[in-house]
Amino acid sequence: MPLPENLIAITMHVLHGSCTGLIIKHIKYFTKILRLINRPTIPYKEEHYAIRVILGLNVFIHPYLAQDVNGLNAKPLTHPMCKPNSTSDIRDAHDLTYMDHIVSRLERLDLTWAFTALRNIWASIHPIPPGLPIDGSVCPGLSFCDADSRDSRTAAVWAVEVQTATNLRAWSRNYDICWSLRHNSSP
């Protein structure tokens, strides 16, 4: 290991971070997303030390969908939601070297307790009981961009319809599940 006085500091400035979440409902959409986010490696250049924008793309996968994807490493999908997940599939995380770089992270969607049909993520769901305790964040997973502060997320787009009870308020720590998302729009 090199001595501390021999280390070279590399300054990286993240000026802005925005995160978008996608919940895919069919295998054909999963393959389309992977084609969009798999980008070529960016060559090493000194001017790339300053990062203008990082767009984090969280791809949430229904547990039963993973078994239908050939060649998908399902190991990162075994972790439940809202817990630290150090084995997430973050592609090209070492190449955060240009504007609008997309970091994809595959997460296991663990919302089956809310659905009437466990094998159909698009089934109609029951309202969340008014007495359900909400302790901490209820969003499906941690985002790359807002690891330091959950209030820093600037965008949240989901593609699943969730019916909530009146006691769930749309404040920063649980707004992901508090909105009616049938139109796939940001809160």
Curated annotation (Swiss-Prot):
Write down the InterPro entries for this protein, in alphabetical order: Gemini_AC4/5_cons-dom, Gemini_AC4_5_cons_dom_1
Domain of life according to the entry: Viruses
Q: What protein am I looking at?
A: Putative uncharacterized protein AC5
**Organism the protein comes from:** Indian cassava mosaic virus (ICMV)
